From Swiss-Prot:
Its EC number is 2.7.8.20. NCBIfam families: PRK12363.1 (NF009027). It comes from the Bacteria. It is an enzyme of class 2 (transferase). The chain crosses the membrane at residues 2-22, 71-91, 103-123. This is Phosphoglycerol transferase I. It is found in: Cell inner membrane. Transfers a phosphoglycerol residue from phosphatidylglycerol to the membrane-bound nascent glucan backbones.
Length: 702
């Protein structure tokens, strides 16, 4: 298909200059197509699989803690491609057209070839894949397959679960990587060594791999929004994961990782599912670890695994059964990182001096040393050790080599009473890792979520089998059910709780939020980003419910209360106010006292301050100058972001110079004062200068 795409692009360029008719339209369409291809190229270099579920997840999840500097080369190439995408516009500007006739036929040919190019491009493939994965499907047939562990553990052994970042078993291949991983290869001969372990859709990046292995479900999101983790109160609240079960069995669950736990919602997941302690990069900063032990992603693995060893000893001495989970980081794509403990260690390879190979060699040694420490300790006999890759390696400096190999995840189980064996799976995935561990703990237990023990010969149907059978045509049913784990299935009643969060089923979401229901009033989509734009552009056959401050919907609302605008499938509308939302509203109730007509263009808050500021009590005058501003009046507010309180609000009209003046009175000191404007999504405001000046009364001299 690549040659077809290339040919279509060349023909599109020729058709662009073949006739001056509609030349700018043709150039704009071609530039847009090239721009989308450039974006796809960047995403593909980051994900290794084009635009997939991981891409959508990270577009919405918290990106704090991402080592963006590692991808500067990819970003530089993308900028170059971005500039190249504009070349059709330049070509139209400088080209002198020689054949003014036949413009209609040329334009028709251009449109036809553009459609061919789109069909031949990876954009069409990925769009089609996402459509089939995210489209509404009936998941009723797979509901009985979702099973949670119930029976008690008779032997509560300690567990140490070591996730190796992108440390797939493919690196064990001695023909391709001789002597690269001698320590883990040796441990594999003493362990239950699971082979041919795949990553299904929804398990192919770090947080997804952890969710899949510990919960037995693929990581999807609140239906359709691909997850804004900073706005969700709970991470998969309806799922019952390994940490939940072990906590009920009297375990203490402890996590230590080198990266920022807020990245992609990892910390939220762990704290929502039975983990008592979550230590991340901030823990090591608090311990005073020197800067030389950190990379762009967090603390290096030598420091991390030393801390894991200390934690293991502390937890073991306490006497309470525990699961200690750790996640390495230095083998992260694209090039890996080398900690100080391995600075003198090199891996000689015919492939060349590749930094990632040195990092993998180091990780093999450091993990091997931690495992040896645990096994040789007086607590080792009562400990099961799990060594697993979180997912297959993403695009890295070895991608060309890995592409020629049979890829498989790493999964080893080591323990005193665990007989070494190699388990050859035909349709196993990381969804089955947790269930396999449970069978090793308690032989009668073989299921966790949609996961099935890979040691059970009579395992019932599973999501892993569905993903590998008939091109995965039944797998979207599992994805659809997994999406309901974010909110539950009773989602027709909405209310605002005391914290100002919207309660949807079992989930709590910080507004603004737009909920789309299908014609049967089943929750179809939750929008958490660009909600006002989505509300304006979503043409639903069911019901829409938009929850935000009343200021979003009304010109005369200055009380800071919450409102919900409900639009049914007949386009009848009703605005519910704070008292109604506190009691709860049913989105499937008939809309009495409704209004008809076009939907209002709702406003959204735009922050004017760069950061929250501590402000003492008193009277102030807010002065700001807006270089770019709406042509009509709009609301400006002073708010306390954490307490979610509107402190002052005024309907403002900038003067000719763009100046806005507004009094702000504070009865008490505020730790987190912010200034924001309410605009619809087509409007913008750009503030050049902003000052909050204390209003000092003039003394009476009479």
């Amino acid at each position: 298909m690549h040659w077809m795409l290339l040919v279509s692009l060349l023909l599109l360029l020729w058709l662009l200059v073949a006739s001056p008719r509609l030349a700018w339209l043709k150039a704009g369409l071609l530039s847009l197509f090239l721009l989308l291809l450039s974006v796809w190229g960047l995403v593909d270099r980051l994900s290794g699989d084009g635009i997939n579920a991981a891409t959508l997840y990270h577009l919405r999840a918290d990106m704090d803690g991402a080592g963006v500097s590692d991808f500067s080369g990819y970003i530089a190439v993308f900028v170059g491609m971005l500039l190249l995408s504009l070349s059709p516009l330049l070509l139209v500007r400088v080209r002198r057209f020689q054949r003014p006739r036949g413009g209609g036929a040329v334009f028709a040919g251009f449109v036809g070839m553009l459609l061919v190019g789109i069909a031949a491009s990876p954009l069409y493939r990925d769009g089609k894949r996402l459509y089939y994965q995210l489209r509404p499907v009936d998941y009723a047939t797979v509901v009985p397959e979702y099973q949670v562990p119930q029976q008690p553990l008779h032997k509560r052994k300690n567990i140490v679960w070591i996730y190796g970042e992108s440390l797939e078993r493919t690196y064990f291949d001695e023909q391709v990587f001789p002597g690269l991983m001698p320590n883990l290869r040796a441990l594999a001969t003493e362990a239950v060594d699971v082979r041919n372990l795949a990553s299904t859709e929804g398990s192919g990046w770090t947080i997804a791999g952890m969710v899949a292995s510990m919960c037995g479900v693929p990581l999807t999101t609140a239906p359709g929004d691909e997850n804004s983790m900073d706005r969700m109160g709970m991470f998969l609240p309806e799922a019952r994961c390994l940490g939940d079960y072990l906590k009920d069995q009297g375990y203490r669950n402890h996590y230590v990782g080198g990266a920022d736990a807020s990245f992609a919602g990892k910390g939220r997941f762990l704290s929502s599912h039975g983990f008592d302690v979550v230590h991340d990069v901030h823990h090591f900063h608090d311990q005073g670890v020197a800067p030389k032990h950190f990379s762009a992603w967090g603390v290096h693995d030598d420091v991390l695994l030393d801390d894991a060893w200390d934690t293991f000893q502390t937890l073991s001495r306490a006497g309470q059964p525990f699961m200690l989970t750790t996640l390495t980081m230095d083998t992260h794509h694209p090039a890996g990182h080398l900690p100080l403990a391995c600075k003198g260690q090199q891996y000689d390879s015919a492939l060349g001096d590749i930094g990632l190979l040195h990092a993998i060699k180091c990780s093999d040694r450091l993990i091997g040393e931690l495992v040896a420490r645990i096994r040789n300790s007086r607590y080792g006999k009562n400990t099961i050790i799990v060594i697993a890759s979180d997912h297959l390696a993403m695009p890295n400096d070895l991608s060309d080599v890995l592409a020629k190999q049979k890829r498989e995840n790493l999964l080893l189980f080591l323990g005193k009473d665990i007989a070494p064996q190699q388990v050859l799976t035909r349709a196993g995935s990381t969804l089955d890792s947790g269930a396999t561990l449970l069978q090793l703990l308690e032989p009668g237990m073989r299921t966790l979520g949609f996961g099935r023990s890979l040691l059970a010969r009579d395992a019932p149907p599973s999501a892993s089998v569905a993903a590998s059978r008939d091109s995965g045509k039944d797998y979207p049913r599992y994805l659809a059910y997994a999406r309901t784990l974010w909110t539950g299935r009773s989602t027709r009643m909405l209310r605002i709780n005391g914290n100002g969060d919207v309660v949807v089923g079992v989930q709590q979401v910080r507004p603004p939020v737009l909920l789309e229901y299908d014609k049967d009033t089943n929750l179809k989509t939750v929008y958490l980003e660009n909600t006002s734009r989505q509300f304006d552009r979503t043409h639903s056959k069911g019901t829409l419910a938009y929850v935000d401050r009343c200021t979003a919907f009304e010109d005369g609302s200055a009380d800071g209360h919450w409102c919900a605008l409900v639009v049914d499938r007949h386009q009848s509308m009703k605005l519910y106010r704070d008292p109604d939302l506190t009691r709860g509203i049913a989105v499937d109730a008939p809309l009495e006292a409704t209004q008809q007509g076009p939907r209002p263009r709702v406003r959204q808050p735009i922050m004017l301050t760069q950061a929250a500021r501590k402000t003492d009590a008193g009277r102030y005058m807010l002065e700001l100058y807006a270089k770019r501003r709406p042509t009509r009046a709009f609301w400006v507010e002073a708010v306390s972001s954490e307490r979610k309180v509107v402190l002052a609000q005024q309907w403002v009209v900038p003067d000719a110079a763009g100046r806005i003046r507004m009094p702000v009175g504070l009865e008490h000191a505020v730790e987190d004062l912010e200034i924001r404007a309410w605009l619809d999504y087509t409007e913008d405001v750009s503030v050049d200068d902003l000052a909050l000046v204390k209003d000092i009364p003039v003394a009476d001299r009479s």
